[in-house]
Amino acid sequence: MIKIENLTKSYRTPTGRHYVFKNLNIIFPKGYNIALIGQNGAGKSTLLRIIGGIDRPDSGNIITEHKISWPVGLAGGFQGSLTGRENVKFVARLYAKRDELNERVDFVEEFSELGKYFDMPIKTYSSGMRSRLAFGLSMAFKFDYYLIDEITAVGDAKFKKKCSDIFDKIREKSHLIMVSHSERALKEYCDVAIYLNKEGQGKFYKNVTEAIADYKKDL
C-alpha cells in the first residue's frame, strides 16, 4: 500500500501561487497495477515524481514500506558530459550490490541498443537515445512498484515490443502505477484506477473502463 496523506504541491507564478493539488489524500491499494487518470494539469506526472522521490511536496506525507522506482524513463537526471556507461555505473553504485554492478551495466547496454554511443557523452544523444537509455536503466533494478509516465510511446515498433515484453515480466513479481493518454495501454496493463477529479481529490475505481468513462464526462 502507498498512502498519500494531506499532500500539497504548488508553484510560484507571476500572477500568484498555483496549486497543483491541495491536501490530496489517496490510498494506492496493495496487489494491483493502478492507472492514474486525470485531465491535463491535474498533477498526475507531478504526483508520480513526488512518489518516486524526484520532486518534493510543500507539505504532506507519502507513507509506504515498498521499494518504489523513480518515474521510468526519466532522462533529465543524466550528466551530459559523462558517457552513457558512466551515467549507468553511477546509478548502479547506488541501487545495486557491488558484485551485481557489472551485470546491471551490461543489461542496460544490451537493452538500450545504443551500440558505440553507450561509450559516448550523453550530450551527443538524440532525445530517443536518451529515452532508451533511461528506460533500460529503470528496468535494471528490482522495485515493488514501477512508476510509468507515457513511457510506452518510446522508440520504434521493435523497441516498443521489447518494452511490452519486459512490462509483462515485471508484473509477475511487481506492480505498476501508470499515467498514459492511451486508453488501450491503461486497460492492458492496469487492474484498477484512481481518477484525479475536478475537485482535486483522488477517487478509486475497481474498473479502469469506468474510471475512463467518468473522466470523459468531466471533459
From Swiss-Prot:
It comes from Escherichia coli. Disulfide bonds: none annotated. Putative ATP-binding protein, and an energy coupling component for the transport of polysialic acid across the cytoplasmic membrane. It is a peripheral membrane protein. Keywords: ATP-binding, Cell inner membrane, Cell membrane, Membrane, Nucleotide-binding, Transport. Residues 2-218 form the ABC transporter domain. GO terms for cellular component: plasma membrane. It is found in: Cell inner membrane. Belongs to the ABC transporter superfamily. It comes from the Bacteria. GO terms for molecular function: ABC-type transporter activity; ATP binding; ATP hydrolysis activity. This is Polysialic acid transport ATP-binding protein KpsT. Its main location: membrane. Pfam families: ABC_tran. ATP binds at residues 38-45. Gene3D superfamilies: P-loop containing nucleotide triphosphate hydrolases.
